Amino acid sequence: MTDILAVAREQVLVRGEGLDQDQTLQVLQLPDDRLDDLLALAHEVRMAWCGPDVEVEGIISLKTGGCPEDCHFCSQSGLFASPVRSAWLDIPSLVEAAKQTAKTGATEFCIVAAVRGPDERLLAQVAAGIEAIRNEVDIQIACSLGMLTQDQVERLSEMGVHRYNHNLETARSFFTNVVTTHSWEERWDTLQMVREAGMEVCCGGILGMGETLEQRAEFAANLAELDPHEVPLNFLNPRPGTPFGDLEVLPASEALKAVAAFRLALPRTMLRFAGGREITLGDLGAKQGILGGINAVIVGNYLTTLGRPAEADLQLLDDLQMPIKALNATL
C-alpha cells in the first residue's frame, strides 16, 4: 500500500490538490509515531500555498446567552442549565474592544451574537456598532449572527461586513447528534447566500464531540466542497450544564493530526486556531499547530471561555518568525 504521506506530498504539496475524504481518513488514522512527519508536511503545504503570514483576529459577544437553539456544546443555549445568562454589550464597549483588538496587530474583528438568527433590534445594534467602529478603528469587520434570510444577507453586505462566520460545526451525518432545533442544510443555505452577496465565507466547526474519524474526514470533505475563505477549528471544551459537559477532552495527538489533515484537505484555505486549543493542546501544542498547518489565530478570550493571553500568541509568532498579516483593505 502506498504511504499516504508520500501521496500527499505529490498531490497536495506539489500540485496543490487537496486530499479527498478517503485519503483524509488515512491521515487521521496514522499512528502517533508518524505525527512529526505529518505536521512537517502540513507546514510545508501551508507555506507553499498560503505563505508565511498569519492572520490575527479578535472576537466579541454583542449578545450573550439566551439562545433558543439546542447546540449541545454551547453554554449560551437558554435550554440548558448552564451558568451563562443573557446580556447585551453597549456600543462604547464594542468600540473599545475593537480598539484593543487592533492594538494586537489584528486585521479582523468579529461581532458575534447568540441567536438563531438576527431580529430587527440586533441588526440595528450591529449597524450602529459597525458605524461607530469605522469612525474610530482601522480594522475589518466580520459578523456571526446565526442563520440569515436573503434580505438580512444583503443588509449586512451593505453595512460593509467583510466576512461572515457560520459554522457547520460537524459532518453532515453527525449533525443531528449535536443540534436538533435546526438542520445542517439551513446552515449550508445561509453560507451560499453569504458567498453570493460577495462577503467572504468563514465556516468551520468543533472537533471532539463524539464524532468518529470517518465523520471527521467527512467534515473535511464537506468543507472542501463549500470552499470557504476561512476554516476556524475549535476543540470541545466541555461546558458544565450542557449535554456535552461530561465528554472527555480530545487527546492532543489526535487534535494535531486533525489540524494537519484539514490542511492537507484544504491546502489554500485560511485555517484558524479557535476555541478549546488551550486545554486540548497547551502551549507546546499551540506551537506544533502553527508549525503543522495553522495560519490564523483568534487572540484573547472567546465568547464564554478564556483564551491564551494575546501577548503569548504574538510572542509565539515572533519567536517562530511568522509575520502577522497586514491590513490591506480600504475601509
UniProtKB/Swiss-Prot annotation:
The cofactor note from the UniProt entry for this protein is: Binds 1 [4Fe-4S] cluster. The cluster is coordinated with 3 cysteines and an exchangeable S-adenosyl-L-methionine.
Q: Which GO terms describe its biological process?
A: biotin biosynthetic process
Q: Where does [4Fe-4S] cluster bind?
A: 67, 71, 74
InterPro entries, alphabetically?
Answer: Aldolase_TIM, BATS_dom, Biotin_synth/BioAB, Biotin_synthase, Elp3/MiaA/NifB-like_rSAM, rSAM
Its annotated pathway? Cofactor biosynthesis; biotin biosynthesis; biotin from 7,8-diaminononanoate: step 2/2
Top-level taxon: Bacteria
Q: What does this protein do?
A: Catalyzes the conversion of dethiobiotin (DTB) to biotin by the insertion of a sulfur atom into dethiobiotin via a radical-based mechanism.
Instruction: Identify its protein family.
Output: Belongs to the radical SAM superfamily. Biotin synthase family.
User: What's this protein's name?
Assistant: Biotin synthase
UniProt organism field? Mycolicibacterium vanbaalenii (strain DSM 7251 / JCM 13017 / BCRC 16820 / KCTC 9966 / NRRL B-24157 / PYR-1) (Mycobacterium vanbaalenii)
Q: Which gene encodes it?
A: bioB
